[in-house]
């Protein structure tokens, strides 16, 4: 479990050192709970680090080795299975939060995270994250959330029941409908 930005940064720094020792250069694009911790000072607990890994596949051995060596990491602590769930639209507003020999780490933009959290709609944690991201983006109307989602996903992919739940939640927090 990761509970602080410092924990994740230390772990990613170690990953970079191990990659560099093998002559590897890897880029991570972090999404999900880890992105909320790293980029948006959201106090949260996340079990893994969801990331798009480029090039894919080259770090599996290093990730497994770290889990075994440390003993406090699950084998899937760096989760690349999230890749098929990411928007196809490039995230032009992502930003580099860490660059060490062997590793460059970008965090998803608030817009992309908002769209991903809204699409996932998995319950209270995602609702809270959507609200935090609305504050960061200074959104005043629920319609702005759906505009961002449509722009990121290319079409409305938010399930109607999730859209209704998010709308109700955000309106209860002071966002207008229009």
Enumerate the language-model features and the residues they cover.
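Compositionally biased terminal segments of proteins
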Residues: 1-178
């Amino acid at each position: 479990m990761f509970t602080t930005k410092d924990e994740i940064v230390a772990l990613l720094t170690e990953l970079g050192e191990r990659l560099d020792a093998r002559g590897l250069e890897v880029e991570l694009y972090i999404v999900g709970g880890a992105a909320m911790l790293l980029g948006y000072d959201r106090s949260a607990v996340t079990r893994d680090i969801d990331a798009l890994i480029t090039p894919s596949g080259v770090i599996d051995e290093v990730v497994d080795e770290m889990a075994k060596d440390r003993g406090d990491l699950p084998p899937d602590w760096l989760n690349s299975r999230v890749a098929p769930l990411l928007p196809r639209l490039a995230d032009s507003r992502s930003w580099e939060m860490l660059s060490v020999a062997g590793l460059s780490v970008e965090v998803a933009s608030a817009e992309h995270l908002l769209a991903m959290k809204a699409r996932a709609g998995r319950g209270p944690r995602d609702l809270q994250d959507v609200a935090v991201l609305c504050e960061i983006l200074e959104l005043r109307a629920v319609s702005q959330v759906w505009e961002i989602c449509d722009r990121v996903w290319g079409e409305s992919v938010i399930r109607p029941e999730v859209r209704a739940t998010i709308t109700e939640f955000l309106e209860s927090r002071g966002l207008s409908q229009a």
